[in-house]
Design a protein with these regions (language model features):
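Active-site lumenal/periplasmic loops and adjacent helix-entry segments of GT-C-fold
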Residues: 130-307, 342-346, 532-533, 560
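Extracytoplasmic
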Residues: 500-652
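Transmembrane alpha-helix segments characteristic
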Residues: 130, 325-336, 351, 373-378, ...
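Perimembrane helix-loop-helix junctions
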Residues: 315-325, 330, 334, 347-379
């Protein structure tokens, strides 16, 4: 290797050139912020129109949900015809502006919103969690430290995949996109709209970090704000909403007990890799913290909940409070949900089915049934159009997808359970699970019906698995858990309200909060301290060179490391991606894997031509896995790029 090589794209610029490049980066960043602001402004107008009685504490998070939904829908609609290109992104902005202008013409204004005495409680409740989230996003997403990109524990595995999908869709312009982690043409059976909401900013010229983070900010505000508003609407109490919020986002089970045996064991929480009170596989503890292990690393979950939680809020008002006029707004909000997060779409269907049964139980009346039929018709048509060529087709003919399996990850393939069914959930979920039955019995009838939708989700998730990884059924189980936290918080507040002595009331609530949240506090602390180098300066230089010199449709021969910068940072197609991605997406990748191994260990020109390989990469990950014959390539092809970490040969 050329140890002294300096990439012209990463080093050696004059100070004047560097300042000019920095100015361009700032311009595109500001332009991207303006673009996002347009969609969020229209989202706020839609929220204001949907719930004209809402205060700013409702309109802001609900508007973020509408804005992100628009950001997913509008570019995708134009991209079907024009590809995912700059004209598509511009037309999407024009369409959003047109919707906003129409709303303004109809008299929709953001001023004059209702006053809400509980709005201060909302923002005070959200502030600590928002600050934690912002810090973790800063340190976990392409965090530049001493010239290298660093990340935290939870993003080390999933984020390279998301970065690669985002970059691939933007730089290729393909829509519907091909699956870029395998050679040839494969269906993209993953809900990719959670990636296109960032791809738009890459198309606009933003750097990858900015593009990745920008839409996540309103998405988090929607998730946090609308959870709180849903809980307050259901319980009619700001205090219960605050407790429910922390029971869910900072809740945990009894996993912390396993670390109290010694000082070394407790210290291991903060130094080990996934040895936390909410993620300790050795002891069958896998009910993870939703902030650090679901929302931050898993974009589909974040953007799914960004739409799902506002949708459940509207569903509560539409179904259980009789506001039938809300059905068109609910339908508009959830249009992209199947390709944002398929599990959230399925959860919403089950909640709506139970809500529909509740409506029928109140009596057959035309004015109550027609809105349900309208909602079903609009969503059914829109969702089927999205799902038939993508996630639904993948579920039906993908590898190890739709199948029967009992009790989530506690169930084993031979039908036995690792732990007793109830003990498994007691030690994983803890206090909330123990309170579910008394909380349900104490709940009001409408609350029981809503939770009945959660029980339908639980029943389905406990018997049917929808993907190769049994663990991923937690995307359904957490929706059930959301509703359980709301009922449990209501029960706790009601019980302790009957304790007259204020010190005892405070002590009792504090004890419950400690038992119900201590594990997550430790987990979040571990995540904040975690720091791993993800890509070196040489990896970044390689990605820069590919960006500037390789064709958008080039296929690279690389190792199947999940960190390969060819895909993760440059967004180029590779012959065979990591099994931790492609297997769990239901793909049959045996042909690509065998070809990858053969092309490294026993290469021949016919196989290269058959797979249409454009470039072959040799780096430490290749030599760690294969007995690679680089000399064969060196004798036949020119070195296209070289630095201290890799050599790349141009095949054609």
């Amino acid at each position: 290797m050329a140890a002294g090589y300096r990439s012209p794209t990463a080093c050696g610029r004059s100070p004047l050139a560097s300042e000019g490049a920095l100015g361009i980066v700032r311009f595109f960043m500001l332009f991207s912020v303006f673009y996002l602001s347009l969609f969020l402004s229209v989202g706020l107008l839609l929220a204001r129109r949907a719930v004209p009685d809402g205060s700013a504490a409702v309109i802001v998070p609900l508007g973020c949900g509408f804005g992100v939904s628009l950001l997913a829908v509008l570019p995708a609609l134009f991209a079907v015809v024009l590809g995912f290109t700059l004209p598509t992104v511009i037309l999407a902005a024009a369409a959003a502006a047109g919707i906003g202008a129409a709303l303004l013409y109809r008299g929709t204004r953001l001023r004059g919103m209702a006053k809400d005495p509980d709005s201060g409680a909302l923002w005070a409740c959200l502030l600590p969690v928002v600050l934690i989230t912002l810090y973790l996003l800063h340190t976990h997403v392409l965090h530049l430290v001493d010239g290298a990109y660093h990340t935290g524990q939870s993003c080390y595995g999933d984020m390279p995949m998301h970065l690669g999908f985002i970059k691939y869709i933007a730089q290729s312009g393909e829509f519907l996109p091909r699956y870029p982690l395998l050679g040839g043409t494969h269906r993209f059976g993953y809900p990719f709209l959670c990636e296109t909401v960032s791809s738009v900013f890459v198309v606009l010229g933003a750097d990858l970090r900015t593009a990745y983070l920008l839409p996540m900010l309103p998405a988090f505000l929607s998730v946090y704000g609308m959870f709180w508003q849903l809980a307050r609407r259901v319980t009619d109490s700001a205090g219960k909403a605050c407790l429910a919020f922390y029971l869910f986002f900072m809740g945990s089970g009894l996993g912390f007990v396993y670390f109290l045996g010694s000082a070394d064991s407790f210290a291991g929480i903060f130094t080990g890799f996934y040895t936390t009170p909410t993620n300790f596989v050795e002891k069958n503890i896998e009910w993870v913290n939703p902030i650090v292990d679901l929302l931050i690393p898993q974009r589909a979950t974040l953007f799914g909940w960004c739409v799902l939680l506002p949708a459940v809020y509207l569903l509560w008002r539409f179904c259980y409070e009789g506001e039938r006029r809300l059905w068109p707004w609910l339908a508009a909000l959830v249009l992209p949900l199947p390709l944002l997060h398929t599990h959230s779409a399925l959860a919403l269907v089950l909640l709506c089915l139970v809500g529909g049964v509740y409506t029928l139980a109140q009596g057959l009346r035309r004015k109550t049934l027609l809105p349900w039929l309208g909602l079903a018709a609009v969503c059914g048509a829109a969702w089927l159009c999205q799902m038939l060529p993508t996630v639904l087709a993948q579920s039906l003919d993908g590898q190890h997808m739709l199948r029967l399996h009992f009790n989530w990850i506690n169930g084993q393939d031979d039908g036995t359970l690792r732990d007793n069914y109830f003990w498994f959930y007691i030690k994983n979920i803890g206090l909330v699970y123990l309170l579910l039955i008394p909380a349900f019995l104490r709940a009001k009838p409408k609350q029981r019906w809503l939770y009945g939708g959660g029980l339908a989700i639980l029943a389905l998730a406990e018997f049917v698995v929808f993907q190769p990884n049994n663990y991923d059924n937690n995307k359904l189980l957490y929706v059930w858990h959301i509703l359980g936290c709301i009922l449990a918080a209501q029960l706790l507040v009601d019980i302790f309200a009957e304790v007259r002595a204020l010190p005892w009331r405070a002590l009792g609530l504090a004890a419950c909060c400690f038992v119900g949240m201590f594990g997550s506090v430790l987990t979040v602390g571990r995540e904040a301290l975690s720091d791993y180098r993800q890509w070196s300066a040489d990896d970044m230089a390689l990605a820069d060179h590919i960006d500037e010199n390789a064709g958008s449709d080039a296929l690279f021969l690389t190792s199947d490391s999940h960190l390969t910068p060819v895909f993760a940072l440059a967004g180029r197609r590779i012959l065979c991606g990591s099994g931790s991605y492609v297997y769990y997406h239901g793909m049959d990748y045996s042909a690509e894997y065998n070809a990858m191994r053969a092309l490294y260990e026993t290469p021949d020109e016919d196989t290269l031509a058959a797979w249409d390989i454009g470039y072959a990469v040799f780096d430490s990950s290749v030599y760690a896995k294969f007995a690679a014959d680089e000399s064969w390539y060196a004798a036949r092809y020119d070195v296209w790029y070289e630095n201290a970490a890799c050599r790349v040969y141009k095949i054609k």
